[in-house]
């Protein structure tokens, strides 16, 4: 039964360990005939995932690079999000995410952007599915570039305060039984594990590349079993302060003990630029 064990093992896709020795890495989302999709290989590795449920409230953004927070959401808003109601996502939901992040961090200003609704077996393509590759959404340079892009003339002033970039992830169907979100203790990520990869859409280089990770035995992974819609995962992608975990990384994984009648996983994640706070 999902959630009855303290850990499980499954596979995730990592960048090959020597990827950083090659030229600038790229991945074409929809390659044309004859084009190379990528100049690196994904490598599957078996990973042990520790269930965070028994110690859910002990994880901290500064120490671990992620945290789990209870935050109520109305069934009506969930249904509007599931129906791809853009106004609901960018209006009511962005406002609730900003309020949550301010409550958790004491931040002065939060900018929400890039919402992704995901569903197992979605027809929306690769970005509508649970993410299968281990990644951190922003490199440091990309996080700063995004601030200038989204905040305009206020960027210089905002960047004088503490600056963080988060991904805020919430299930839309509960509980999550299959393809849960895994997060890694940021203290166990080595610099050599991180590889910037440009995702090419329509032959246009992504100017804000994410980090993809290579596998290391020292990495320690967690997931929250049977995660509910009122349990939100906040995952750090960047931090301007010197703290034990400057970032975490995340990925979905196929749970080995999922019931055959488990509903498809549905979720929403929103990226945030966070200024000020503790």
From Swiss-Prot:
InterPro entries xrefs: AsaB-like
Keywords: Oxidoreductase
Any one of the GO BP annotations: novofumigatonin biosynthetic process
The UniProt record lists the keyword Oxidoreductase: yes
Keyword Oxidoreductase: yes
EC number of the protein: 1.14.11.-
Reaction(s) catalysed (UniProt annotation): asnovolin A + 2-oxoglutarate + 2 O2 = fumigatonoid A + succinate + CO2
Deleted gene: phenotype: Completely abolishes the production of novofumigatonin, but accumulates asnovolin A.
EC class of the enzyme, as a word: oxidoreductase
Molecular-function GO terms, alphabetical: oxidoreductase activity
Coiled coil: none
Pathway given in the UniProt record: Secondary metabolite biosynthesis; terpenoid biosynthesis
Similarity comment: Belongs to the asaB hydroxylase/desaturase family.
Purpose: Fe(II)/2-oxoglutarate-dependent dioxygenase; part of the gene cluster that mediates the biosynthesis of novofumigatonin, a heavily oxygenated meroterpenoid containing a unique orthoester moiety. The first step of the pathway is the synthesis of 3,5-dimethylorsellinic acid (DMOA) by the polyketide synthase nvfA via condensation of one acetyl-CoA starter unit with 3 malonyl-CoA units and 2 methylations. DMOA is then converted to farnesyl-DMOA by the farnesyltransferase nvfB.
Protein name: Fe(II)/2-oxoglutarate-dependent dioxygenase nvfI
Organism from which the protein derives: Aspergillus novofumigatus (strain IBT 16806)
Upper taxonomic lineage: Eukaryota, Fungi, Dikarya, Ascomycota, Pezizomycotina
């Amino acid at each position: 039964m999902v959630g009855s064990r303290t850990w499980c093992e499954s596979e995730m896709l990592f960048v090959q360990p020597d990827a950083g020795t090659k030229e600038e890495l790229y991945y074409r989302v929809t390659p044309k005939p004859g084009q190379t999709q990528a100049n690196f290989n994904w490598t599957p590795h078996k990973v042990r995932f520790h269930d965070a449920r028994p110690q859910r409230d002990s994880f901290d953004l500064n120490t671990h690079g992620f945290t789990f927070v209870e935050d109520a959401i109305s069934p009506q808003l969930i249904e509007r999000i599931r129906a791809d109601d853009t106004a609901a996502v960018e209006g009511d939901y962005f406002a609730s995410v900003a309020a949550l992040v301010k409550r958790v961090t004491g931040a002065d200003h939060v900018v929400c952007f890039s919402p992704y609704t995901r569903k197992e077996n979605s027809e929306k393509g690769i970005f509508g599915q649970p993410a299968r590759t281990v990644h951190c959404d922003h490199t440091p340079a990309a996080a700063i570039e995004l601030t200038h892009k989204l905040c305009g003339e206020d960027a210089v002033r905002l960047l004088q305060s503490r600056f963080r970039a988060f991904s805020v992830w919430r299930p839309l169907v509960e509980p999550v039984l299959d393809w849960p979100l895994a997060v890694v203790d940021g203290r166990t990520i080595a610099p050599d594990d991180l590889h910037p990869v440009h995702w090419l859409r329509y032959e246009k280089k992504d100017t804000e590349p994410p980090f993809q990770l290579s596998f290391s035995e020292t990495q320690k992974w967690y997931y929250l079993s049977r995660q509910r819609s009122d349990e939100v995962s906040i995952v750090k992608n960047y931090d301007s302060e010197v703290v034990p975990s400057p970032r975490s990384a995340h990925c979905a994984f196929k749970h080995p003990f999922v019931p055959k009648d488990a509903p498809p996983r549905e979720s929403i994640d929103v990226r945030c630029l966070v200024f000020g706070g503790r």
